[in-house]
Amino acid sequence: VAGVILAGATAVVVGFEIHALALIPFAALVVFWAFYHLDSLLLAVVAITPLSVVLKESDFNVGLSLPAEVMLAGLTLFAFIRFLHQGRLPWPILNQALTQVILLQLGWMAFTILFSEMPLVSFKAVLSRVWFIIPMYFMLGTAMEQPWVRKLIFPFYAFSLGIAAIWTLSVHSQYGFSKETSTWVMFPFYKEHTMYGMALAFVYPWSIGALWRSQSLVWRFIHLGLFLLLTVALVFSYTRAAWLSLVAAGAVYLVFAWRISARQLLLIALVAASSLWLTQDQWMRIFTKNDTVSSDNFSEHIQSASNISSDASNLERLNRWASALRMWQDRPHVGWGLGTYQFQYAPFQKSSQLTFISTNGGGMGNAHSEYIGPLAELGWPGLVWVVLLITMIFRTGVGAYRRLAPGTDRSLVLVALLGQVTYWVHGLLNNFLDLDKGAVLVWMSAALIAWAGRSGAGIRG
């Protein structure tokens, strides 16, 4: 019977050129996989995410990252059907404060659909958040009760990202590794270089940790090769925000390594903030007088990060932020609706802030911030929920790290925390939670942190 159905479906696909039906065998395989070994399917989604592509220029344009997002949506539907059948919820996860913040944030996103300037756009945006969070946080979080799942999430993503990096470097080499071509050579796996750099930075702490753990000589060479590959890929991504985020992650690692207490950390932060406040005029003069623009020269490229007078990328970012703040001032409490910024910000631009890369169209990106974007789209509560989410991720993770026994799990929690540091520091300048490449990393590591938060002990090894 199955053979007849498959043959019939193939005939329809070929005869009527209905290409979507070609997904039927793949969908059947995924459904079978979900019923018989859900945990490995979740890991397969993690592994396939860096290699998924968006088919925008083809007749089969669904606006999704394939096959990752289709699989995530299918897993969400599977979870819903399973709940209707079994009536069971993952109460250990639901009872955690981190989970409750995530659900309340989702609830606020859903509530603001009622006031959205583009309700259908906001509904789709909320729906995509749901199909990222349910498989990667709730389902994968449940699967992490098994040690082998916890151990494989980062290597599965990192090695697949390594394949994408080899492709990217190969294409990039044909253009002399120039800065100009670095923005698109990672296509079709990553839309542009900032997203690619974010992913590289997120898994980079894991690649360092993998070098130092006890392992065979063969695996040590494999991990060394991956580390070197990711390092080269990071350098030639020309992503300044990714480089900055790794500096921040390194500083946080030193806090753990040197066992700096919360009181000492607060004192350091107060001294640093006071120093910046007292010297703000000098810093502004440095920023405004810096005319170094991004280029192939790595030294100049790093210096250009503080150029707010002539660097087009920096000025456009300031233009997007200013537009977002004006949108928030216009609708301070409920915002314009999730996912609407790129379609609504154009009238809020000022001619004096426009750059040669500015646009009035809706296809050129978002607010370039995980903080200011929610402010414009969801009102001031949107920013509050982001701050609460970050706070609970790190509060849960730091508490778990201190409680877990030294060993594999403790190291994984540290890697997850450092990955989160890279993301949220990068999030000052870009935002990717609405895309599978970023969402899978953030929510799978949050699931690991949540597991550690409710776990009593770690595994030595």
Where are these regions (language model features)?
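Membrane-interface helix caps and helix-loop-helix hairpins in membrane proteins
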Residues: 13-16, 58-62, 115-124, 235-236, ...
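Long extracytoplasmic/lumenal interhelical loops at the membrane interface
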Residues: 178, 187, 307-322, 326, ...
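Alpha-helical transmembrane segments of multi-pass inner-membrane proteins
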Residues: 1-13, 26-33, 76, 102-114, ...
